Amino acid sequence: MKILMLCREPRLYSCQRLKQACQDRNIQLDILDPNRMLIKLAVIDAQMQAQLYYQAGEIYDKCRAEPSLLAEYDAVLPRFGVSSTMMGCRVLDYFAAKKVVILNNSTAFRLARDKWSSLQVLAAQHIPIPTSSFAGALFSTAAHISQHRIPLVIKTCSGSQGVGVMLSESKVHSVSLLQTLQQAKVDNLLQDFVVEARGQDIRAFVIGDRVVAAIERNGLENDFRANIHQGGSASVIQLNTAEQQLAVLAAKTIGLDVAGVDLIRSNKGLLVLEVNACPGLDGIEKASKLDIAGLIIDYLLAMKK
């Protein structure tokens, strides 16, 4: 068994844990950066074919190694960040055309990485989300803000680990933030702020048809974001059956095999904040004491059968 992990930062906790899980199962794992790859479409042996090349080293290296044709793989595990989404998904498309097993296909990955598009898909399936809006460049900023109550949440449409998520507590501040984002040509969306859940949310880790673990995350004092990467803390919790079903439904609606589903408790019930295609393992493993990495690899092996 030979697996390819697409990852820019192999030293990260999640990548190292998945690497260890493969080693424990005597699986060969190659960890390669999709940004160092080239996909070639050409007629080879009188037939149109696709080839994938990889080039090690850095752009500034004077004696950089020549690109090499990549070998075949049995399965692909995407773990690339937001900045690598476009190239990473094109590499996933390459392997999909070759019928290689992929954990989280490119269509689902692209959708999950677009916060607004994913919210639209969730809402179309009547999955509860916070009141949200997206406006075109010629729509009045003031009129856009008036669709929400203050304070409100402003999010960039791409971003992870709490980066690009801002809480605005006045109309003046909201206008200033939106004008800045528009000037920088950064797509953004607005959401109602769930006051009653300030600084706290839930991460449900979904693998296949079940929630394998769930944690409650609490943000730092005076920070409404509960992300672990922003300094938040986590404690393991048990979701009831309905809550687990909502998390699994959200992941499946986006099309993901493995997902981190972020939930928030409101006066209207449980809401889905977003669905992550590349959820980190650090917080969930340390809080739950479970071998989530091993469960992911076992699920990938089951997909291969």
UniProtKB/Swiss-Prot annotation:
Residues 119-301 form the ATP-grasp domain. It is an enzyme of class 6 (ligase). Keywords: ATP-binding, Ligase, Magnesium, Manganese, Metal-binding, Nucleotide-binding, Protein biosynthesis. Mn(2+) 1 binds at D262, E274. GO terms for cellular component: cytoplasm. It comes from the Bacteria. Binds 2 magnesium or manganese ions per subunit. Its EC number is 6.3.2.-. Mg(2+) 1 binds at D262, E274. Mg(2+) 2 binds at E274, N276. Its cofactor is Mg(2+); Mn(2+). ATP binds at K155, D192, F193, D201, R225, A226, N227. PROSITE patterns: ATP_GRASP (PS50975). Mn(2+) 2 binds at E274, N276. It holds the Pfam family RimK. Signal peptide: none annotated. Coiled coil: none annotated. One of its GO terms (biological process) is SOS response. GO terms for molecular function: ATP binding; metal ion binding; ribosomal S6-glutamic acid ligase activity. The keyword Nucleotide-binding applies. HAMAP family: RimK. NCBIfam families: rimK_fam. Belongs to the RimK family. This is Probable alpha-L-glutamate ligase. It comes from Haemophilus ducreyi (strain 35000HP / ATCC 700724).
